[in-house]
């Protein structure tokens, strides 16, 4: 990269700046260290810094070069530090006849030493001394550092002599790594060269295994902290898996082991091919571009690519919308593909280290191998071997000789429980072009793949390796289209391909009985569908495969399933089942969470869709896996209870047992179960309590919660309290439950939800029940904020106290809500098109109003309040939150108990609700490019 490419003269003119400072010094009346002179020098340097950064940002916007920008910013800093240090040593604290001790080298270390910076990057400096520090040296260091700090820079520094550097590098791997990146800036160059030579001879030589092992362990620990997957939808560009630090780690390792200074030398050594070097440089350039834009856009050292800045970064990088994908999603897909490339490079370099050169270094193989190097054949043709519990290729040409071996490798690894040798994965990555239409249609390849997908062992692990190597996306091109695809919303925590793999992992865990407590029904049902278990694995792999297309992904996905299943070897009837499951994979979740399960019409309609018990079982398990694999905290016990209720109610219809008597019998059974748990209560009191809740309460609420509610209500009655709240944290589900007992009235739900919002509680779910004596028992789930249950319980009790104060008139709700009208920062990045549907076909008795919109504090209170103001009675409400989006369903009648059938009145209701929902959407673009949004 030439200076012409960098256009460094446009960043800062070193000679002009140096001359300006010297002229200021020559004409100054004050001492060079005086406060007035110091202010002049500082302002001159600050102006140059601001101008250089602005120029670097302008150039980045024009040429898009991330590496160019990082080098330009580094050059800017080099120039300012060089001139400042020169001023400090020749003007502020000059030495007429310096002794040997009064020499110093200023050295860039760490990230700054590597020669690239973003605007907010730390500046790590080493003031290198020949001996001990001197008074002159202390003055120079202090002057330089304070000037840099006053310029607003984050400067890390150390002042050491060479002996101290060597001793500390031997003891501390972080210091050793920082010195590995050391780069001379200014001062005594011979002093720096001495450090380089001694570092090479006394530290690096003979310690290669130790260093590499430490760096790989450090990388693994960093991944665990930042998130194991490289496909988190708000990735850390610097520290996350597949981010900049992974590239740094690779170069540290190769630099330490091969004694190279540049990546280009790795091609000459055979570690990387020219294509792989190009991949390395492209990944580095892209990550630098993203990181530099993030720092410029946020005016701080922002390393997390959060939802609220993704749209601006995508715009800066020039992404536009395509059919089915907005511009943010296209940008993030590119990001995740680059992260995947970084993973490929990691495997390639590890393979080269182990196989090409490491055998010449005593002890190196201990980094990778725990056991002796025993080999055994894994296949009759000798194409694969097991080497120290890892599968490897016996010859470099086995994939070219028979491309089916690219699938067979994974099949054998699964069957024998082997890890993958990096050499085998490297060879796979370099052979992807062999996967063509012939291989995709090969019956043997598809048979092997289906056995991998439906393996009784750990299919997710093998499929993950297939995906990481690129084989899965090439073998199933439709899957390749969703690799690294993110969905620009706060609900989905992972990319689409990562979600599908996690779905398969959940199913495998259910099948192995590992989720028996959390998912008892799924755990039971999986044992009854052995003949159809394969269909579930195929469905889970395919159910979101059509994401990112203009049409409904369920319908498009069903069409893809119809095409792929015969290729995998499924029969026509099996194909039909998978096609149906893919098309309906969202139905059970939607009905369970958004419909009244105590309404006969809900169950009848759902049963008409499902039609058979076999499909019902498959759909239930599919739904559980799908929800659970969305991300942490998405699944909770209440969703499980709703799904189980829907399953059991539908089972009665499909088996011919659905009747009011059956419901009554189940209600009776539930009341008897509760009576048994309350056996220590006096009979008269127990019977009176059991008559309070209506049937829907007993059919929806778990027995443990019923017992808890019973004691809660009993205690309130004994204390003579008509209004009381109770809090219960649920650590595993990342939610906290607040139960409210209060006299029922038309706007009660609106007041409760408003008070909750005013207290900072983000409502994610709610259950509403009334009792036969005119009281309401409402249970609200709010997002968890604290890690410990004690802290979270105290916080929830404060929320409960606010609810009590508002309901009792001690606090004024409108004033409280006015203080919390701003949506969360992340939510401000999104737009959800408001939608209101008024439907009289979903219930025989009620009109169902379904609203969809952008979540915001107090929205549920506003909705329920408006519905009450429209002279409607809410019989039940079903609140569902999908990240930034809410979908709420209200079962309503007019004040005399009739449906809302008048078209004019329906139009008025819809118009007012849409106005309320649209109030916060404003000009947000939901990730569409400005052109597309216009």
Curated annotation (Swiss-Prot):
Its EC number is 2.7.7.59, 3.1.4.-. Uridylyltransferase (UTase) activity is inhibited by glutamine, while glutamine activates uridylyl-removing (UR) activity. Residues 380-736 are annotated as: Uridylyl-removing. SUPFAM superfamilies: ACT-like (SSF55021), Nucleotidyltransferase (SSF81301), Nucleotidyltransferase substrate binding subunit/domain (SSF81593), Poly A polymerase C-terminal region-like (SSF81891). Modifies, by uridylylation and deuridylylation, the PII regulatory proteins (GlnB and homologs), in response to the nitrogen status of the cell that GlnD senses through the glutamine level. Under low glutamine levels, catalyzes the conversion of the PII proteins and UTP to PII-UMP and PPi, while under higher glutamine levels, GlnD hydrolyzes PII-UMP to PII and UMP (deuridylylation). Thus, controls uridylylation state and activity of the PII proteins, and plays an important role in the regulation of nitrogen assimilation and metabolism. Belongs to the GlnD family. This is Bifunctional uridylyltransferase/uridylyl-removing enzyme. The gene is glnD.
């Amino acid at each position: 990269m030439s200076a012409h490419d960098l256009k460094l003269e446009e960043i800062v003119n070193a000679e002009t700046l140096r001359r300006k400072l010297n002229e200021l010094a020559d004409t100054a009346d004050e001492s060079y260290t005086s406060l007035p002179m110091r202010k002049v020098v500082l302002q001159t340097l600050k102006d140059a810094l601001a101008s250089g950064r602005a120029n670097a940002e302008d150039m980045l916007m024009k040429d898009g070069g991330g590496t160019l920008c990082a080098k330009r910013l580094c050059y800017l800093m080099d120039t300012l530090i060089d001139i400042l240090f020169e001023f400090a040593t020749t003007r502020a604290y000059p030495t007429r006849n310096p002794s040997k001790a009064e020499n110093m080298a200023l050295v860039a270390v760490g990230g700054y030493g590597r020669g690239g910076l973003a605007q907010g990057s730390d500046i790590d400096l080493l003031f290198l001394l020949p001996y001990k520090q001197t008074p002159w040296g202390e003055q120079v260091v202090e002057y330089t550092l304070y000037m840099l700090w006053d310029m607003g820079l984050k400067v890390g520094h150390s002042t050491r002599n060479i002996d101290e550097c060597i001793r500390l590098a031997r003891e501390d791997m972080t210091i050793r790594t920082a010195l590995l990146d050391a780069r001379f800036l200014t001062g005594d160059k011979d002093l720096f060269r001495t450090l380089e030579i001694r570092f090479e001879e006394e530290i690096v030589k003979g310690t290669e295994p130790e260093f590499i092992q430490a760096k790989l362990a450090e990388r693994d620990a960093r991944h665990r902290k930042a998130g194991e997957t490289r496909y988190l939808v708000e990735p850390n560009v610097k520290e996350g898996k597949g981010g900049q630090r992974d590239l740094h780690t690779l170069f540290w390792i190769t630099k330490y082991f091969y004694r190279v200074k540049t990546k280009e030398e790795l091609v000459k050594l055979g570690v990387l091919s020219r294509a792989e070097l190009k991949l390395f440089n492209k990944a580095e350039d892209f990550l630098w571009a993203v990181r530099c834009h993030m720092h410029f856009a946020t005016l701080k050292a922002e390393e997390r690519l959060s939802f609220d800045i993704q749209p601006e970064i995508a715009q800066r990088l020039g992404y536009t919308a395509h059919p089915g994908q907005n511009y943010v999603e296209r940008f993030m897909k590119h990001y995740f593909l680059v992260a995947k490339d970084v993973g490929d490079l990691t495997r390639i370099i590890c393979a080269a280290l182990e196989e090409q050169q490491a055998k010449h270094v005593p002890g190196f193989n201990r980094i990778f191998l725990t056991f002796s190097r025993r080999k055994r054949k894994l296949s009759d043709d000798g194409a694969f071997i097991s080497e120290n519990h890892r599968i490897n290729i016996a010859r470099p040409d086995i994939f070219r000789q028979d491309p089916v071996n690219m699938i067979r490798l994974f099949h054998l690894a699964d069957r024998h429980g082997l890890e993958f040798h990096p050499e085998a994965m490297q060879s796979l990555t370099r052979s992807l072009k062999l996967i063509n239409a012939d291989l995709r249609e090969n019956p043997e390849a598809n048979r092997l793949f289906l056995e991998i997908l439906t393996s009784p062992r750990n299919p997710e692990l093998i499929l993950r390796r297939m995906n990481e190597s690129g084989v899965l996306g090439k073998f199933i091109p439709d899957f390749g289209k969703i690799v690294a695809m993110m969905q620009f919303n706060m609900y989905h925590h992972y990319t689409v391909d990562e979600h599908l793999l996690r779905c398969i992992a959940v199913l495998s865990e259910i099948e192995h009985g590992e989720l028996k407590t959390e998912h008892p029904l799924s755990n039971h049902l999986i044992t009854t569908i052995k003949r159809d278990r394969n269909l579930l694995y195929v469905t889970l792999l395919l159910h979101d495969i059509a994401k990112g297309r203009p049409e409904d992904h369920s319908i498009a996905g069903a069409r893809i399933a119809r095409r792929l299943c015969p290729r995998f070897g499924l029969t026509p009837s099996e194909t039909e089942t998978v096609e149906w499951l893919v098309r309906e994979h969202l139905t059970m979740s939607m009905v369970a969470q958004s419909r009244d399960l105590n309404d006969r019409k809900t169950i009848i309609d759902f049963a008409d869709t499902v039609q058979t018990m076999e499909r019902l079982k498959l759909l239930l398990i599919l739904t559980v896996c799908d929800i659970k694999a969305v991300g942490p905290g998405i699944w909770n016990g209440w969703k499980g209870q709703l799904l189980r209720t829907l399953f059991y109610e539908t089972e009665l219809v499909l088996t011919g047992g659905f009747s009011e008597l059956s419901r009554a019998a189940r209600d009776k059974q539930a009341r008897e179960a509760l009576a048994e748990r309350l056996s220590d209560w006096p009979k008269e009191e127990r019977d009176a309590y059991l008559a309070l809740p209506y049937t829907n309460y007993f059919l929806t609420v778990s027995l443990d919660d019923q017992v808890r509610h019973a004691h809660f209500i009993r205690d309130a009655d004994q204390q003579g309290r008509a209004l009381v709240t109770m809090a219960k944290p649920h650590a595993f589900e990342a939610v906290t439950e607040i139960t409210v007992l209060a006299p029922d009235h038309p706007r009660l739900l609106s007041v409760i939800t408003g008070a909750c919002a005013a207290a900072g509680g983000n409502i994610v779910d709610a259950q509403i029940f009334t009792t036969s004596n005119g009281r309401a028992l409402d249970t609200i789930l709010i997002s968890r904020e604290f890690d410990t249950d004690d802290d979270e319980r105290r916080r929830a009790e404060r929320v409960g106290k606010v609810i009590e104060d508002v309901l009792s008139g001690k606090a004024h709700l409108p004033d409280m809500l006015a203080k919390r009208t701003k949506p969360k920062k992340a939510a401000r990045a999104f737009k959800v098109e408001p939608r209101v549907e008024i439907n009289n076909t979903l219930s025989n008795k009620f009109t169902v109003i379904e609203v969809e919109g952008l979540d915001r504090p107090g929205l549920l209170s506003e909705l329920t309040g408006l519905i009450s103001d429209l002279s409607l009675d809410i019989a039940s409400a079903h609140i569902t939150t999908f990240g930034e989006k809410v979908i709420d369903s209200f079962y309503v009648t007019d004040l005399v108990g009739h449906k809302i059938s008048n078209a004019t009145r329906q139009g008025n209701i819809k118009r007012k609700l849409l106005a309320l929902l649209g109030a916060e959407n404003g000009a947000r673009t939901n990730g569409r490019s400005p052109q597309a949004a216009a």
